[in-house]
């Protein structure tokens, strides 16, 4: 992670791996921000990480004060499927349900870990 300019107040953070764990909230005076995708690639549906793996990573990043943004794929089918005779325009912009499920789990796990940490102080 790096700060690209003195004007940046957070790191851009684009990555395709879960290898980077911040040492703390700040990287060269900028908020540590990590941005990766849940699907097989940017803007793709599905989940490429096991629930436990991505949840543990999110907890490690946020525990150090870092920020994690998880990019999701939206359904992009549109128009009329003449083979099926149905209108598929209702799926445009809908987040993949499997990614929604995984995001909810990650949020729950991060909140639970933060509450446990607060309780143990």
Predicted regions mapped to residue ranges:
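Mature catalytic domains of secreted/periplasmic carbohydrate-active enzymes
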Residues: 1-121
């Amino acid at each position: 992670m790096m700060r690209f300019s003195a004007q940046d107040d957070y790191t851009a953070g684009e990555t395709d791996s879960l290898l980077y764990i911040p040492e703390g909230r700040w990287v060269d005076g900028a908020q540590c921000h990590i941005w990766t995708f849940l699907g097989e690639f940017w803007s793709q549906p599905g989940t490429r990480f096991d629930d436990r793996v991505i949840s543990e990573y999110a907890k490690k990043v946020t525990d150090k004060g870092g920020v994690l943004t998880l990019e999701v794929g939206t359904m992009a089918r549109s128009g009329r499927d003449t083979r099926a005779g149905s209108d598929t325009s209702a799926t445009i912009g809908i987040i993949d349900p499997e990614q929604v499920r995984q995001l909810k789990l990650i949020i729950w796990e991060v909140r639970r870990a933060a509450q446990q940490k607060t309780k143990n102080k």
